[in-house]
């Protein structure tokens, strides 16, 4: 799911901004990078922490506090299944009045729910067109 989302984001010309580590983040980065997209990793520590698909590494040394940078740097947030770091990104995005699309992630009031990556991209495009994101 994450890799497909990355591919679709790249195909639509979007830049992927994420935490730049492994797991779901790496899968999304892989999909975007292998499809010619721009991938920015906002890293908790040093550049060496980045997964191999991150094209632009931003070493913050800020651990979880970097989530504020990730969200502030984004036009919208697509949340995939994750833990409390994902939850904090959702909360920050809602507080900053950014569109949040939940793709199998936390079910929180104010977020849009997508059943698959294609629907997430459709919702993102609609939010961007309407100036909500």
Segments predicted by a language model, with ranges:
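A generic local structural motif
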Residues: 2-4, 25-27, 44-45, 64-66, ...
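Short, well-ordered alpha-helix to beta-strand connector turns
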Residues: 13, 54-55, 74, 97
């Amino acid at each position: 799911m994450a890799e497909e989302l990355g591919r679709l984001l790249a195909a639509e010309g979007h830049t992927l901004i994420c935490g730049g580590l492994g797991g779901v983040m790496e899968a999304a980065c892989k999909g975007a990078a292998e499809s010619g997209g721009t991938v920015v990793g906002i890293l908790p520590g040093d550049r060496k922490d980045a997964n191999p698909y991150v094209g632009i590494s931003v070493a913050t040394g800020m651990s979880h506090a970097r989530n504020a940078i990730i969200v502030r740097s984004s036009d919208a947030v697509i949340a995939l299944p994750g833990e409390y770091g994902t939850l904090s990104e959702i909360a920050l995005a809602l507080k900053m009045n950014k569109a949040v699309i939940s793709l199998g992630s936390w079910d929180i009031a104010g977020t849009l729910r997508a059943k698959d990556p294609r629907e997430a991209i459709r919702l993102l495009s609609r939010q961007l067109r309407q100036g909500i994101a």
